[in-house]
Amino acid sequence: MGKIIGITGGIASGKSTVTNFLREQGFQVVDADAVVHQLQKPGNRLYQLLVQHFGQKIILENGELNRPLLASLIFSNPEEREWSKQTQGEIIREELAALRDQLAQTETVFFMDIPLLFEQDYSAWFDETWLVYVDRDVQVERFMKRDHLSKEVAESRLAAQWSLEKKKDLASHVLDNNGSRDQLVAQVVKLLEGGDSCARD
């Protein structure tokens, strides 16, 4: 069975820089967000579940899900958020487990990019976990710039998630992305070669 490494981070922490680099190096990277996106396409498992739960109002004219509306329905209501975490979470876990088992047959090392890796107890799946970390003020600034948000909105969305500080204590390796892309990639190369990344505090 192959070595499995979990990669996680936070909004705008720079996780995609790491996963894109790994793919360029020829590694297989399972993208949990892409798996969810696929499951939410018309007719697929999450699509059916969500329409059954929220009704026709979440379907656009072209048959796709109205993702912004869905996000606001789920994130504005703690009960809906809990429902989503449990029900969608179970289906997502099944799909990711199937992909993991499939790749473990053929790959010596592969990666799984899971945004809620620690929050949803995926840690036990992995031989190592890598956290892409940035300081909070850098994260807010990058998030505002990336999604054209006000500081207030960016702060409130980040507040709804576990902080990167909290995740830092749980990860086996921390990739510091407060600097440039090249500095981040250099840390990834070091880990691939078997060294540690930046020093853990």
Stretch-by-stretch model annotation:
Residues 14, 33, 84, 111, ...:
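Residue-level signal for inorganic ion chemistry
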Residues 28, 34, 128, 172-173:
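Well-ordered beta-strand positions
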Residues 37-108:
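ATP-dependent small-molecule kinase phosphotransfer cores
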Residues 1-34:
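Walker A (P-loop) phosphate-binding motif
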Residues 97-104, 109-145:
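ATP-dependent NMP and nucleoside kinases share a basic, alpha-helical "lid"
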Residues 193-201:
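Generic C-terminal helix-cap and adjacent flexible tail
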